[in-house]
Regions:
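N-terminal pilin/flagellin-like segments and related low-complexity appendage regions
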Residues: 45-276
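N-terminal single-pass transmembrane signal-anchor helix
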Residues: 16-46
Length: 276
């Protein structure tokens, strides 16, 4: 005969809801979104920090390549211009107007003393499709190209010893070191529009930089008018501005800057028997 289940053997919870209610699902999704946002912030910061570190490595490598070039060639390379596709760009004439050329003239005048790192001339990588060295942000914008500025010291007028063939040896270290118009590097914290000839009231980090190599950082594509004075001080690409700003990243400054002092340059060339 059929077996009949007693009431004690049947489901004691006939009204139990199977699965989650909409309210419970919403609470779970809210918790997940909060956890994701908490995790995402450190990850974003880590990615940004890694890009800064990588950019610093690239800039330091570039500085070593520049020193190596100076040791082998007896001079510093001129910066690349916006149209020289990663190759050093010069002026045909040592004075007056500048007709650009990629052929080294005897006077050594650079067409863009504050231009781009000449990655093709130096043989370094990584580079963009036009041959310009790039920082670690690599979003395809021209602003991601690594910048490079070189001292335009003249002796005599119309001759640029630091970038002329064997110009450093010819001009002598004493003459070059005695000049007061090499590149300046200032500490961050500018409260007024930066000068183009000195650090003004800002702390001076160097008055004898032979070259400055730098990246405009994460916000390199931001309109210059939106940047603080510290970053504006590094924006005069193509000009004869000899003043730059360097410091740790903060809320208004994220440029990555290093420089090559005359003393280090001279020391490395002396070690290689290229000077005096």
């Amino acid at each position: 005969m059929p077996i009949r289940l007693s009431p004690s053997r049947v489901n004691h919870y006939p009204d139990a809801i199977e699965g989650f209610s909409l309210i419970e699902i919403a609470v779970v999704l809210l918790i997940i979104s909060v956890l994701v946002s908490i995790v995402a912030i450190p990850i974003s910061s880590q990615v940004e920090a890694s890009r800064i570190v990588e950019t610093r490595k690239r800039i330091e490598l570039a500085r070593e390549a520049i020193v190596g070039f100076a040791v082998s060639q007896g001079r510093l390379p001129c910066p690349a211009s916006a149209t020289s596709v990663g190759v050093s760009s010069y002026c045909v004439s040592g004075t007056g107007g500048c007709a650009a050329t990629t052929t080294l003239p005897t006077h050594g005048r650079c067409s863009d003393p504050n231009g781009f790192l000449p990655a093709v001339t130096l043989g370094i990588s990584p580079v963009d499709a036009q041959g310009y060295a790039i920082d670690a942000w690599q979003d395809g914008a021209d602003a991601r190209r690594i910048r490079y500025a070189v001292s335009s010291f003249q002796s005599p007028v119309g001759t640029f010893p630091l970038t002329a063939a064997n110009g450093i040896r010819t001009a002598t270290m004493d003459t070059i070191a005695a000049a007061s118009n090499h590149l300046y590097v200032c500490a961050t914290g500018l409260a007024i529009a930066p000068s183009t000839s000195s650090c003004g009231t800002a702390t001076t980090l160097s008055t004898q930089a032979a070259a400055v190599i730098y990246s405009l950082g994460k916000n390199g594509t931001t309109a210059y008018a939106d940047l603080g004075f510290d970053e504006k001080n590094n924006q005069d690409v193509g000009s004869n501005d000899i003043v730059f700003t360097a410091g740790d990243p903060n809320s208004t400054y994220d440029d990555v800057v290093t420089w090559l002092s005359l003393n280090i340059l001279f020391g490395r060339m002396v070690q290689a028997n290229k000077l005096p």
